[in-house]
Amino acid sequence: VLSPADKSNVKAAWDKVGGSAGDYGAEALERMFLSFPTTKTYFPHFDLSHGSAQVKGHGKKVGDALGNAVAHLDDLPGALSALSDLHAHKLRVDPVNFKLLSHCLLVTVACHHPNDFTPAVHASLDKFLANVSTVLVSKYR
């Protein structure tokens, strides 16, 4: 459960991401594909090269979904229900991949905002992304 301080940290960090959420999402995806090559198996139809339109497009979806989650911190299950259904029933993404992408998102935010990425912000974003991952895998059972 996110504390009031966590919620404040997440909102403040996401405000810094601002209109670049799609770019951060794409960068995190690229980082994930390079660091964890097995994740590429879910995107056999994508051009996974640096800067590809398909990775940018999916990065925008990731960024938009996270922005929606930040806007609904008190109701993540409601905000992410359709996405949970999609990943569990249609895409059948292995749940471990959400943890890998979360790690890559943390690294991406830290790289772009090193002075703002304090231990407290890091912990809050990590909790938030863990909560998002938990919601996304909730329909797997």
From Swiss-Prot:
Annotated positions of the Phosphoserine modification: 3, 35, 49, 102, 124, 138
Residues modified to Phosphothreonine: 108, 134
Residue ranges constituting the Globin domain according to the UniProt record: 1-141
Sequence positions bearing N6-succinyllysine: 7, 11, 16, 40
Residue positions binding O2: 58
In-chain residues carrying the UniProt-annotated modification Phosphotyrosine: 24
Annotated Gene Ontology cellular component terms: blood microparticle; haptoglobin-hemoglobin complex; hemoglobin complex
One Pfam family here: Globin
Modified residues (N6-acetyllysine): 16
Single GO term (MF): oxygen carrier activity
Sequence positions that bind heme b: 87
Biological process, per Gene Ontology: hydrogen peroxide catabolic process
Keywords attached to this entry: Acetylation, Heme, Iron, Metal-binding, Oxygen transport, Phosphoprotein, Transport
Superkingdom classification of source: Eukaryota
Entry-linked PROSITE patterns: GLOBIN
Tissue specificity statement from the Swiss-Prot or TrEMBL entry: Red blood cells.
Family recorded in the similarity comment: Belongs to the globin family.
Known role: Involved in oxygen transport from the lung to the various peripheral tissues.
UniProt subunit comment: Heterotetramer of two alpha chains and two beta chains.
Name recorded for this polypeptide: Hemoglobin subunit alpha
Gene that specifies this protein: HBA
